[in-house]
Swiss-Prot record:
Protein name: 33 kDa chaperonin
Annotated source species: Shigella boydii serotype 4 (strain Sb227)
PANTHER family for the chain: 33 KDA CHAPERONIN (PTHR30111:SF1)
Any GO BP: protein refolding
Lineage per the UniProt record: Bacteria, Pseudomonadati, Pseudomonadota, Gammaproteobacteria, Enterobacterales
Gene Ontology MF, one: protein folding chaperone
GO CC, any one term: cytoplasm
InterPro entries: Heat_shock_Hsp33, Heat_shock_Hsp33_C, Heat_shock_Hsp33_N, Hsp33_helix_hairpin_bin_dom_sf
Gene name per UniProt: hslO
Length: 292
């Protein structure tokens, strides 16, 4: 049976190593449902969703993380944004033919991974790593070694459960300021690598952890729900319209009679007529009606 989208944190009592396990199905389906992506693009977004959830769970503060793939390939952009409450959204842009069995480098071409961390309070941090690994997991492991000098392993699996897209992943990381033995970390990584896609996507988290680590002492913490949530709003659209030259806005109104702002993440449409624009320019709140 497919599990509810959740993230589980766990800790090895005898090693200075922490872990995370996440499975997503409903959240992934909501990200994909408003778009007709080729299967390889769906797979990349699934991997990005898992990776972003795992990375967001490493935050020690309120804020969000955006994990973005950019390049000159036929999929020139893929991005997932998530916050410390495990609220996720994402989108991809395709500008060319996608081979049926395209791998990551074929999709992105010459590109890189951008990780942007935005605390609710404090300065934003951005890290960039070249798309040198063969997988997203390998690229992100490289990011952790360069930016935080913390040995980190990611294990990401994608597939279908009951005919619907699903994905899951696990993260192992040496605890900051701890001296975990490399042999111990490698041992745990070797165990984790054996997880089968079907097991990860269909079994309860506690059973997965027992199958992998039944000879180790593991503390598992209360799970956190993962969900799709878009941050778009009529107010955000109004703020965006304020940044456009009046002439450009008036030209669209004259030609179309209204301005239709579409959210790529969730598919919502926000309509603004001439009266709405006048209210925006007068710093009043635009009328409430909204079309989905």
């Amino acid at each position: 049976m497919p599990q509810h989208d959740q993230l589980h944190r766990y800790l090895f009592e005898n090693f200075a190593v922490r872990g995370e396990l996440v499975t997503v199905s409903e959240t992934l389906q909501q990200i994909l449902e408003n778009h007709d992506y080729p299967q390889p693009v769906k797979n990349v977004l699934a991997e990005l969703l898992v990776a972003t959830s795992l990375l967001t769970a490493t935050l020690k503060f309120d804020g969000d993380i955006t994990v973005q793939l950019q390049g000159d390939g036929p999929m020139n952009l893929a991005v997932i944004n998530g916050n410390n409450n495990q609220q996720m959204r994402g989108v991809a842009r395709v500008q060319g033919e996608i081979p049926e069995n395209a791998d990551l480098k074929t999709l992105v071409g010459n590109g890189y991974v951008v990780i942007t961390i935005t605390p609710s309070e404090g300065e934003r941090y951005q890290g960039v790593v070249g798309l040198e690994g063969d997988t997203l997991a390998a690229c992100l492991e490289d990011y952790f070694m360069r930016s935080e000098q913390l040995p980190t392993r990611l294990f990401i699996r994608t597939g279908d459960v009951d005919g619907k897209p699903a994905a899951g992943g696990m993260l192992l990381q040496v605890m900051p300021a701890q001296n975990a033995q490399q042999d111990d970390f490698d041992h745990l990584a070797t165990l984790t690598e054996t997880i089968k896609t079907e097991e990860l996507l269909t079994l309860p988290a506690n059973e997965v952890l027992w199958r992998l680590y039944h000879e180790e002492e593991v503390t598992v913490y209360d799970p956190q729900d993962v969900e799709f949530k878009c941050t778009c709003s009529r107010e955000h659209c109004a703020d965006a319209l304020k940044t456009l030259p009046d002439e450009e806005v008036d030209s669209i109104l004259a030609e179309d009679g209204e301005i239709d702002m579409h959210c790529d993440y969730c598919g919502n449409h926000y309509l603004f007529n001439a009266m709405d624009i006048a209210e925006i320019r007068n710093n009043a709140s635009p009328a409430d009606p909204q079309v989905h």
